[in-house]
Design a protein with these regions (language model features):
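Short, mixed-charge, low-aromatic patches
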Residues: 1-7, 60-66, 85-87, 126-132, ...
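Short, well-ordered secondary-structure micro-motifs
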Residues: 72-75, 157-158, 195-198
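Short, surface-exposed amphipathic charged segments that create phosphate/polyanion-binding patches used
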Residues: 75-82, 159-163, 202
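Conformational coupling and interaction surfaces
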Residues: 1, 16-22, 27-28, 164-167, ...
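Active-site histidine-anchored catalytic micro-motif
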Residues: 1-49, 57, 89-193
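A residue-level signal for conserved active-site and pocket-lining positions in enzyme catalytic cores
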Residues: 62, 176, 244
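Metal-dependent C-N hydrolase catalytic cores
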Residues: 3, 44-112, 289-300, 308
């Protein structure tokens, strides 16, 4: 599979990149950085450092994209520490970012190989929305768009109604869901259901003592502490890397449904909420077209196995 990852590189974004670099059959063709978790230039350094740690320095270009959301001001995520890497203090990578803008890189790569490139969008959707506004043909030329964001009509992680990626740029999310892409959506609801590693799984990874399992141990430290305070046990959550694992191996999906996904852009309390509903609502409403497949349950065992393979 030929893949572009659009990322706000921090914590779990980096394990997703490791999966894409290390899983046989996957070619990570480019990384595009988007506004999100931590200050923009730090995210670029985190992406470059991750590529270097994985042994792919100079082989995967990194492009800089949108530095702020479309309408509302940027807000950092507090999940991953100030540097997004739990203070792991990785050396500055030798590779430097490209000069071409991420939006143009996405358009160029997709239009050069229509129907061949998948995009994994694991950040606010600003870059993808700007790309499809500039070149609407990419909606049909991207083979598949795998999105991590929103909830399945459930509780979010940044507000009770919203997940971070859609909350930060709901206008961009709305544009992307209305653009005609072939979308699979992996939500925060799925994250809490299928992506968690419990204490025994974490011990198994730490016991591997490989350079990449050590990278995982260090970079996941702050989110694990936050999760322990919030959920009462030392779990680790993997919204982005589960989405990547599903993209690389859709057999992980145990249950999914076709749905209409609409993003709330105006609600005072519900801004960034993803309404996930069937195409026909009743006679007060027009019929809506299905615009995404929403993953409900994925195999935690299969995901855990893929992560261990990537770290080995
Ligand atoms: C998403 O937001 C970010 O904090 C994570 O990187 C992930 O993409 C989870 O809400
Ligand atoms: Ca992310």
């Amino acid at each position: 599979m030929r893949l572009i990852i659009d990322t706000d590189t921090a914590g779990d974004d980096t394990y997703s990149m490791l999966l894409a670099m290390k899983t046989p059959g996957s070619t990570l063709e480019a990384v595009t950085v988007c506004v999100g978790n931590v200050p923009f230039d730090q995210q670029v350094e985190n992406a470059l450092a991750t590529i270097e740690v994985a042994g792919f320095s100079g082989k995967i270009p990194v492009y800089c994209g949108a530095r702020r959301p479309m309408v509302k001001p940027w807000e950092p995520s507090t999940m991953h520490g100030n540097d997004g890497m739990s203070g792991a203090n990785l050396p500055i990578a030798r590779q430097r970012p490209e000069t071409l803008h991420a939006v143009d890189a996405i358009i160029e790569k997709v239009m050069a190989a229509p129907g061949e490139i998948d995009i994994l969008a694991q950040a606010p959707l600003t870059n993808i929305a700007l790309a499809v506004m500039k070149e609407p043909r990419i909606a049909k030329a991207v083979r598949h768009l795998w999105i991590m964001g929103g909830t399945d009509n459930s509780v979010g992680n940044i507000t009770p109604c919203a997940e971070y990626n859609f909350f930060i740029d709901p206008e961009a999310a709305r544009i992307v869901f209305e653009a005609g892409f072939n979308i699979t959506l992996s939500t925060w609801t799925l994250t809490m259901r299928s992506s968690l590693f419990e204490a025994d799984q974490l011990e198994e990874i730490f016991a591997m003592q490989t350079p990449l399992s050590e990278f995982y141990r260090k970079v996941s430290a702050v989110p694990r502490q936050t999760a322990e305070a919030r959920y009462g046990r030392p779990i680790s959550t993997h919204p982005d890397s589960l989405t990547c694992a599903i993209a690389l191996n859709p057999d992980l999906i145990e249950s999914a449904r076709d749905a209409v996904v609409r993003i709330e852009t105006m609600g005072e309390i519900t801004r960034g909420f993803s309404a996930v509903h069937p195409p026909v609502l009743g006679n007060r409403w027009p019929d809506f077209k299905v615009n995404a497949r929403v993953v409900e349950v994925a195999s935690n065992d299969g995901f855990f196995w893929m992560m261990k393979q990537a770290f080995s």
